[in-house]
Amino acid sequence: KKTYYPSSKNFFRVTLNHNSDSYEKIQLHIKNNDPRYIIQAISGIIYFRDKLVSEKEFLKKHNEINKNLSSSLSNLKISKAKKRVLEQDKTGNSFHFTIYYDFNDEGTEYIKLGCVMYGSEYFEKFKYIDHLRLGFNSKNFSYWLQNEAFE
């Protein structure tokens, strides 16, 4: 099933059940009306449904994946993880921890390891679940996500 973002239909996402030991879901992003269905972003997702343990479990899994990726991708520029407010949530009650493994100096093509914890108002509005995501984004998709998807 195609799902669109709140402010733009330039890309859509399809989420597939995966249920492996590593990820619950696999998410693909494709440019709308692309007759070749070229994947612009692909992510593995783990959901954390228990708010009482989310942050602790997030950080444990986040650190484990980061350790593995950092040793495998040591030639890439790797950002430091910090707890930051999720810009899309205007209440300021949603947070994310994100690390970027950049393929170029422009920061436009990268692997992204992130955890998102939603505030109660944002959760009630969109029904998004706290999650960890490991994904690769193309340059075009990255630009769209940062500048158009949540305007």
Task: Set out the residue ranges of the language-model regions.
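Generic detection of intrinsically disordered/low-complexity segments and helix-coil linkers/edges
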Residues: Y5-P6, N17, L52, F95, ...
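Surface-exposed beta-strand edges and their flanking turn/coil or helix-capping segments
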Residues: E55-E57, K125-D130, Q146-F150
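Intrinsically disordered, low-complexity segments enriched in small/polar residues
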Residues: K2-T3, K9-N10, D21, P35, ...
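Soluble, non-transmembrane alpha-helical interaction regions
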Residues: G135-F136, W144-E148
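A charged, solvent-exposed segment within the mature domains of Sec-exported extracytoplasmic proteins
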Residues: K60-N140
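Long, charged/polar, surface-exposed segments that mediate recognition or autoinhibition
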Residues: S20-S94
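N-terminal leader/targeting segments
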Residues: K1-I38, F150-E151
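Prokaryotic Sec-type signal peptides and long signal-anchor helices
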Residues: T15-L16, Q27, G107, N140, ...
